[in-house]
């Protein structure tokens, strides 16, 4: 057991360990409140005095819900080691979340947006106070659950942090190699002598790698054998890649995110965005509302992100980019009713949707349905190596578990899609039937009116009504092997015919 004046902990309750300190779960001696204590080791005291106190000074300056709070600075009894008493985050770190097999292919979109919002807010507070972190990575982003069960992410570990204005530079090297800016990587990992100075944008590179890792479950730049086994190739990948190049399929949220990551993962600091532009672009994403659209031709659910002040025309264009259904051919159903979206209206008029209650999109164009497109999870199942290797076997088993969870996620998406597909087709057939009934009723009324006007010719008119009814039914539900697809397009045609029949009655 170890303790300070007000806090007590057991060395078995280790939360994390670094080169200069260890972090433990501790309790307040009086209240029993759980806290995290950072206990500095003897190696930490070999650093210059100003470096030793820098973390205390930085944390005292910060006060934000997305930054771990500092409660007190105390000392252990006998050894008089410095101890930082901080807020305890019970749900581990973002790294532990990403290490879970169900997130092997990235966080769910909703959870990723929570990470993005929290990291951006925390970093914005750092820059407002002129602080550069210098060691942004998933392991230094803690997670706890709010009162309503929502995730809250907080930046932590300010051992490498220091005050630095936008136009200032530093030459000391800190950080974790997978998340280091290439210029720092060259000097810290490859041990190549160079006298480059670094600015605040090195944090942007680390943020870009972290966000990519959270979105996809993997690092953006990985050489064969891994980044720690092939360091020279790792450096060449990051420095020789084309400007703006980044892996990732551009769909939904990713189409908004990829340009941001591409512009912060730039080696040349002159080409890299500054924090002002990064905050502006990420805020643009976070201020958008999501509209859930289920495409019947694709049998797929899409997330369309738009601003409330956008017009419906912008929404229709965004749907076109994801579904290839042109705006003039888009028709929507919502909760069983035809939903008419006027292009000039504000997007605020679009109904509130959820994943289980989306807008249902069908196309008025005679196109062949594209069907589902997904990657077979079996392709991601790794192979076990013949020789016994505990670490390799662990990684392989973890990869297999990740592929299993991906297959489960895909199966759930397919089942949900099947339900939405059946429901959408049911609504579509009901709409067709209602339109046909209205059109036939108008036609019948028109013929009755004509028969009363023609007198002796009424018998012929009755025969004509039967013929028209047969023709109408054959047009709406034509016979053939393709079944319902033949009766899909004429909704507007039937509406026009109904209007023409009404005009005949008025005459």
Task: Mark where each language-model region is.
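Protein kinase glycine-rich loop
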Residues: 12-19, 23
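Glycine-rich ATP phosphate-binding loop
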Residues: 22-43
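Conserved N-lobe beta3->alphaC-helix segment of eukaryotic protein kinase catalytic domains
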Residues: 39-62
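A short, aromatic-enriched beta-strand patch in the conserved N-lobe beta-sheet
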Residues: 72-74
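Conserved short submotifs of the Hanks-type protein kinase catalytic core
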Residues: 79-93
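Activation segment signature within eukaryotic-like protein kinase domains
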Residues: 115-116
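Catalytic-loop of the protein kinase fold
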Residues: 127-144
